[in-house]
Amino acid sequence: MKLSEIALKVDATFSGEDLEIFALNSLKNANKAELTYCDGEKNAKFISTSNAGAILVTKSLLDLVPAGMVALVCDNPHLAFAILSKIYAKPLFCEPKPSNIAQSATIMPNVYIGSNVSVGENTIVMAGAFLGDNVTIGKNCIIHPNVVIYNDCVIGNECHLLANCVIGSDGFGYAHTKTGEHVKIYHNGNVVLGDFVEIGACTTIDRGVFESTMIANYTKIDNLVQIGHNCELGNGCLIVSQTGLAGSTVLGRNVVMGGQSGSAGHVKVGDFAQIAARGGVSKDLPGGKKYAGAYPIMELSEQFKFQAKILRFFKKN
C-alpha cells in the first residue's frame, strides 16, 4: 500500500516520496519498506536511529524525524497504527502446504494440523490439540489434550505442554478513540519456547506484536498463568500458579515468581531474583534478592520490618 493511501485511511498528512509500504514494524526493527510509529516522548529518542521508511508521529515530534524517513503527521499515531494493523494482519489460514511429521511421532485422533507444520521425532500430540499453520515442534515433546498452538509459533525440544494451555493467542492491546471506542491492535509476532520448557494446564502465552514472546530453556510455568505479549523469560525461571506478567516484562535467568504475583508492563527483573506470593513488580528490580509486597514492593527483609512497624503502631494506638 502506498503512503498516500495510508494517509487517507488514518487522516494523516505527509510530504516526500510516496513509498510502497509492505508491513508494520517497531522503531527498533523496521526497514525501508516498513512503517513504524512513535506516540510519545518516552520512545522519541529511538526515532533518529530507526531504519524505517516512514513513521507515524505527532506534529510535536516532527523535527526528530531524520532525513530519508517520511513522516506521516497525525493526532494519534497509536490509534492510526491500530487501524493499519488490521489491514496488515496476517491471514488466519495460509495456502495449503505439506507438513513434515516425523515417522516416530505419535498423533492421536482429532488433532488439527495446519499448513506447513513440523513435528519432531518421538513427539506425542494428544487428542483435540490444534497446531496452526507454520508451527514447529521439536523432538521428544508431549502436547497434552486440547492444547492450542497458534500460527507461526515455535516449540523447542523436550517440552511438555499440559492440557488446555494456549500458545500464541493475540495480546491484549488496544488504542482508544476520543469517544471511548477501543480499537484492536492485531499481532503479527509469535511465541518461541526453548528446550525443556514446561507449560501448565490452562496457561496462556500471548504472541508479540511484531517480534516474539520468548520463553528460554528450562523455564517451568505452572497452571493458570498469563504471560503478556512481548515478554522475555530467561533460562530456568519458575512461574507459580495465577501469576500474571503484563506485556514486555523481562525476567532474567532463574527468576522465581510466587503464586498470584504479577508485574506491570515494561519492567525488568534481574537474574536470580525471587518475588514472594502476591508480590507486585511495578519497577525494575536488581537480581539476586528476595522481594515482597506490592505498593511498594521492597526487599523481603525490609518488608518484615515494615510490617512490624505497622503492628507496633496499632498496638500503641
Swiss-Prot record:
One of its GO terms (molecular function) is N-acyltransferase activity. It holds the Pfam family LpxD. It catalyses: a UDP-3-O-[(3R)-3-hydroxyacyl]-alpha-D-glucosamine + a (3R)-hydroxyacyl-[ACP] = a UDP-2-N,3-O-bis[(3R)-3-hydroxyacyl]-alpha-D-glucosamine + holo-[ACP] + H(+). Its EC number is 2.3.1.191. The active site is at H229 (proton acceptor). CDD domains: LbH_LpxD. Catalyzes the N-acylation of UDP-3-O-acylglucosamine using 3-hydroxyacyl-ACP as the acyl donor. Is involved in the biosynthesis of lipid A, a phosphorylated glycolipid that anchors the lipopolysaccharide to the outer membrane of the cell. Homotrimer. This is UDP-3-O-acylglucosamine N-acyltransferase. It comes from Campylobacter concisus (strain 13826). The gene is lpxD.
